[in-house]
Amino acid sequence: MVADIKGNEQIEKYSWREACDTGSSRMDRKHGKYILNVEHSENQPPITHPNDQEAHSSICWCLPSNDITSDVSPNLTGVCVNPGILAHSRCLQSESCNTQVKEYCRNDWSMWKVFLACLLACVIMTAIGVLIICLVNNKGSANSSIVIQLSTNDGECVTVKPGTPSPACPPTMTTTSTVPASTATESTTSTATAATTSTEPITVAPTDHL
C-alpha cells in the first residue's frame, strides 16, 4: 500500500510536465517584453527534481497559440513556465524601477545642492563687498581736514590745519558789541552841545558906579 501511494504521488508530480511536451525554455528581457524561445523536442525525457518542493513549484501552463506573441513560433502548443522565474523577473523589474527612481531623486537633490551653494556664495560675496565699502568710507571721513581761520593784527587771515604747528603771531581776539542806533545818536548830540557851551566866551560888562 505504501509503495502504491508513493507511485501515485510521483505520477501526479510529473503529470503536468509530461502533458506539456516542451524542450528547453529561455527567457530574455528585451525592451520591457519577455520573449520565450522554446524548441519543440519529442525525444527529450522529462526533467526530474530530487526535492518535492522544487517539483511542486514548477507548473506547466498550456497556452493556446492565439495568446502567443509574434516572436514565438506559431507551432508552439504549450509552454512550461516556472512561477518562481516569473516572480524573480517581476522582482528584478521592480528593483530596477526603484533604482531608477532613486537615481533620479539623487540627481535632483544634487542640483538643489549646487543651487543652494551658489546662492550662499553670492550672499557671502555681497556682504564682504558692503563691509569693504563701509570701511573705506569711514577711513575717508577720519582723514578729513579741519580748517581754522584766524585774523592777525595786520588783517591777514591765517589757516591752521590739524597736525601743523600754529603760526608765530598770536591771533587778536576782537569783540564786537551791538549798540542800538538811537542811543548812539543821543550820545553824539550831547557831546556836541557840551562842546559848544564850553567854548562860548563869557563877557562881563563893567559897571562904574560911584
From Swiss-Prot:
Domain of life per record: Eukaryota
Pfam families registered for this protein in UniProt: CLLAC
Regions crossing the membrane: 114-134
Record keywords: Cell membrane, Golgi apparatus, Membrane, Signal-anchor, Transmembrane, Transmembrane helix
Membrane-side (Extracellular) residue stretches: 135-210
Main location, first listed in the record: Golgi
Functional note: Plays a role in the regulation of cell proliferation. Promotes activation of the AKT1 signaling pathway. Promotes phosphorylation of AKT1 at 'Ser-473'.
Name of this chain's protein: Dynactin-associated protein
Organism whose genome encodes this protein: Homo sapiens
Lineage: Eukaryota, Metazoa, Chordata, Craniata, Vertebrata
Chain's gene name: DYNAP
